[in-house]
């Protein structure tokens, strides 16, 4: 068990921070979301001018405490395999689901049950699929993290995931096995529900992904040395882009790439669901000639605000509404690389096209001021991310501090990120859930980085992260099984004088920890399980930047089918992993 550094926060300090936040809230002007909240939503029909309605529920429903039970099951069958594709016109080996990148859309309504059968037809890789942002209330067995909630699915094996859509909005699913999702093993998710602003049409997900023509597995060696990994080759929007061939002798460069396109009709309002599924890319999203009204971050509806661009880090989502009020023409949709965060060979060429005339084939001749904005490796300003359903952070049962370092070890490990001097390194064959199920929890391996939450239900835990690594990189931290209550971020180390926002703080499941700074977050122990928290820069999670939150292990329960699946998958995995053809673990495993 990892030993955090525990601190006690004085009640007077908390009261001061709460009072300050409360005073700021009182001074706020009425918002569009407040107007929607004032409408009687009971049993009203969800439509273009009543998006806050949802039958017996509404945008005002506290989704942490109640959700519909539709009785509807949405069922999907996924086949994972090694194939050759050319998403941007450059042919290469990829990992794909149902032979597509991104994989199939998972679509459900708030309150539906979702069942996904995953078959692994890869040749030498295990896998497991994580449903990013899905709360998995009392359902830890289906979180899809190898070495934590299950053993990997071996080649030729299958696994069934089952979960309820208890929140609504936009997300994605991806492999949580090493670097697999950066090679294509990912796809979009939409959970339909109410919204904090009205719109006419839902255009679905806009998936922003960095892309490399050299396999990230081949680049992994370079990621472990001081110079870091080389620049990536390109980026994709919804699995498409153009790559400009420069070597006429390169037979892999087919030149068949194309841009993703959308059609706007003058006067309509469109919902677009932005998802950053990148390996280590920060994007600034913008559409030339149009503003964006932001209505949700991750799975949390927020009070709408209007901007001309949105910063989106790895693992994050923003739902935006775009009004088609520009002159009828063609416009660039942009995912602008923040190159001071991470290099890319074609940083300004991640483009889609908005067309008012669907018959047009002309390229846009437009620009955007965001091309000249300073790079931003952090998040949208916290003061803009105001949750519509107001929830305050309770007083902490315990507050613990974790300091981030960067240590050098002998190869093959090289550079590793550590929290309180320990890096995460799991054993695929001995997942935490298996040890809990078999009551073998007396001694967890130190590199499992197990953080035991306070005993008892509904205790508030405060976590302080300090970055003292002296590295020039922020970290998008993703928490499984919960939303962060983001109490504060800032430069330098956290001190007792650092301000905290306790009244309705921003909530989301992926938040950026500033470079050489601190992040303080809270969550309530209302969901038994082993929950991973990790950096969503894939290089960094592979280099050990993460830990496990072991929450109320005595209340972790399994159905007979879940227990059987856990043990059978581990038996099959161990049999495969002992064979000469096995894939050797070369990173943290997640």
UniProtKB/Swiss-Prot annotation:
The keyword Metal-binding appears for this protein: yes
Keyword Mitochondrion carried by entry: no
PANTHER family: MULTI-COPPER OXIDASE, OXIDOREDUCTASE TPCJ
Protein family per UniProt: Belongs to the multicopper oxidase family.
Segment forming the signal sequence: 1-28
Function: Oxidoreductase; part of the gene cluster that mediates the biosynthesis of the bibenzoquinone oosporein, a metabolite required for fungal virulence that acts by evading host immunity to facilitate fungal multiplication in insects. The non-reducing polyketide synthase OpS1 produces orsellinic acid by condensing acetyl-CoA with 3 malonyl-CoA units. Orsellinic acid is then hydroxylated to benzenetriol by the hydroxylase OpS4. The intermediate is oxidized either nonenzymatically to 5,5'-dideoxy-oosporein or enzymatically to benzenetetrol by the oxidoreductase OpS7.
Induction: Expression is negatively regulated by the global transcription factor Msn2 that binds the stress-response element 5'-AGGGG-3'.
Designated gene of the protein: OpS5
Gene Ontology MF: a single term: oxidoreductase activity
UniProt keyword list: Copper, Glycoprotein, Metal-binding, Oxidoreductase, Repeat, Signal, Virulence
Annotated pathway: Secondary metabolite biosynthesis
Highest taxon above the source species: Eukaryota
Protein name as it appears in the record: Oxidoreductase OpS5
InterPro entries named among the record's database cross-references: Cu-oxidase-like_N, Cu-oxidase_2nd, Cu-oxidase_C, Cu-oxidase_fam, Cu_oxidase_Cu_BS, Cupredoxin
Glycosylation sites: 82, 98, 125, 291, 348, 365, 420, 439, 472, 493
Null mutant phenotype: Impairs the production of oosporein.
Any Pfam family the entry gives: Cu-oxidase_2
First-tier enzyme category under EC: oxidoreductase
Annotated ranges, domain Plastocyanin-like: 80-194, 205-358, 427-554
EC number(s) from the headed UniProt entry: 1.-.-.-
């Amino acid at each position: 068990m990892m030993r955090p550094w525990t601190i006690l926060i004085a009640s007077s300090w908390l009261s001061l921070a709460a009072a300050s936040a409360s005073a700021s809230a009182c001074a706020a002007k009425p918002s569009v979301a407040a107007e929607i909240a004032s409408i009687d939503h009971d049993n009203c029909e969800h439509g273009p001018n009543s998006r806050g309605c949802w039958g017996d529920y509404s945008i005002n429903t506290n989704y942490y405490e109640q959700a519909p039970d539709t009785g509807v099951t949405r069922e999907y069958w996924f086949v994972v395999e090694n194939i050759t594709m050319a998403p941007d016109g450059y042919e290469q080996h990829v990992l794909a689901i149902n032979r597509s990148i991104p994989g199939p859309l998972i679509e459900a309504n708030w309150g539906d049950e979702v069942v996904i059968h995953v078959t692994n037809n890869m040749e030498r890789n295990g896998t497991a699929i994580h449903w990013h942002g899905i709360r998995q209330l009392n359902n830890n067995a289906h979180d899809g993290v190898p070495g934590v909630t299950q053993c990997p699915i071996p080649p030729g094996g299958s696994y069934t995931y089952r979960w309820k859509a208890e929140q609504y909005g936009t997300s994605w699913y991806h492999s949580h096995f090493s670097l697999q999702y950066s090679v294509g093993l990912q796809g979009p998710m939409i959970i339909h529900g109410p919204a904090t602003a009205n719109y006419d049409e839902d255009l679905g997900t806009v998936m922003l992904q960095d892309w490399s023509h050299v396999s990230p597995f081949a680049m992994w060696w370079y990621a472990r040395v001081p110079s870091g990994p080389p620049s990536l080759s390109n980026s994709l929007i919804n699995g498409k882009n153009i790559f400009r061939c420069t070597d006429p002798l390169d037979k892999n460069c087919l030149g068949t790439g194309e841009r993703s396109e959308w059609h706007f009709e003058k006067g309509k309002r469109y919902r677009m669901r932005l998802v950053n599924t990148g390996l280590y890319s920060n994007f600034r999203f913008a559409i030339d000639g149009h503003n964006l009204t932001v209505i949700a971050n991750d799975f949390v509806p927020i009070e709408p605000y209007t901007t001309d661009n949105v910063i989106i880090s790895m693992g994050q989502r923003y739902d935006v509404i775009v009004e088609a009020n520009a002159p009828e023409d063609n416009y660039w949709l942009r995912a602008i690389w923040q190159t001071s965060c991470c290099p890319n060979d074609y940083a300004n060429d991640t483009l889609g096209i908005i067309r008012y005339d669907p018959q047009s084939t002309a390229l846009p001749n437009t620009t955007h001021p965001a091309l000249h904005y300073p790079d931003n490796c952090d998040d949208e300003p916290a003061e803009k991310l105001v949750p519509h359903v107001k929830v305050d952070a309770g007083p902490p049962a315990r507050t613990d501090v974790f300091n981030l370092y960067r240590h050098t070890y002998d190869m093959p490990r090289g550079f590793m990120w550590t929290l309180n001097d320990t890096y995460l390194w799991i054993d695929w064959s001995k997942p935490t859930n298996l040890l809990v199920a078999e009551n073998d929890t007396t001694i967890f391996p130190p590199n499992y980085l197990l953080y035991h939450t306070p005993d008892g239900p509904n205790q508030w835990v405060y976590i302080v992260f300090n970055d003292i690594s002296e590295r020039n990189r922020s970290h998008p931290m993703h928490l499984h099984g919960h939303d962060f209550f983001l109490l504060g971020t800032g430069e330098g180390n956290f001190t007792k004088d650092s301000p905290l926002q306790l009244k309705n703080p921003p909530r989301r499941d992926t938040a950026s920890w500033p470079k050489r700074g601190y992040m303080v977050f809270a969550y309530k122990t209302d969901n038994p399980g082993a929950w991973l928290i990790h950096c969503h820069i894939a290089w960094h999670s592979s280099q050990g930047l993460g830990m496990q939150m072991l929450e109320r292990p005595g209340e972790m329960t399994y159905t007979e089918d879940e227990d059987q699946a856990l043990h059978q998958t581990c038996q099959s995995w161990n049999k495969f992993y002992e064979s000469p053809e096995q894939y050797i673990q070369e990173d943290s495993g997640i």
